[in-house]
């Protein structure tokens, strides 16, 4: 099956061997996205809401680079470091999905960068082949 790698302009080097997004058969898979700048430094340390906004803006850039919009996102995998941040994460998340919400799950776990508070991976259905 043909696939297309999606790397938005200005994307920093990934922390491991992966790409920001892969489009195959009209489905976009967005890699786990941390609140990182182009040099892989965590941004907005200690602020789960600001980190969530940064992560969702990064995901939005991947989806848009593939020709879609956030309305095309059908599933989100949310990883958070501390349940105490659940409300702040949800408040920002709701801004990006004001209409019909995508399916999702949310788990608490350790993240690869110790000061990161949230990571999100997404799936979007764009309705067009790679």
Swiss-Prot record:
InterPro entries: RutC (IPR019898), RutC-like_sf (IPR035959), YjgF/YER057c/UK114 (IPR006175). CDD domains: YjgF_YER057c_UK114_family. Its EC number is 3.5.-.-. One of its GO terms (molecular function) is deaminase activity. GO terms for biological process: nitrogen utilization; uracil catabolic process. Belongs to the RutC family. This is 3-aminoacrylate deaminase RutC. The gene is rutC.
């Amino acid at each position: 099956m043909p696939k297309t790698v999606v790397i938005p302009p200005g994307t920093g080097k990934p922390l491991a061997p992966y790409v920001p997004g892969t489009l195959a058969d009209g489905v976009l898979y967005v890699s786990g996205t941390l609140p990182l700048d182009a040099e892989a430094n965590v941004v907005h340390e200690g602020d789960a809401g600001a980190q969530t906004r940064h992560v969702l803006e990064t995901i939005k850039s991947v989806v848009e680079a593939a020709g879609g919009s956030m309305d095309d996102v059908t599933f989100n995998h949310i990883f958070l470091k501390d349940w105490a941040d659940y409300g702040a994460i949800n408040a920002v998340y709701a801004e990006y999905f004001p209409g019909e919400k995508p399916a999702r799950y949310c788990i608490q776990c350790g993240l690869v960068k110790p000061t990161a508070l949230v990571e999100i991976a997404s799936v979007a259905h764009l309705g067009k082949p790679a």
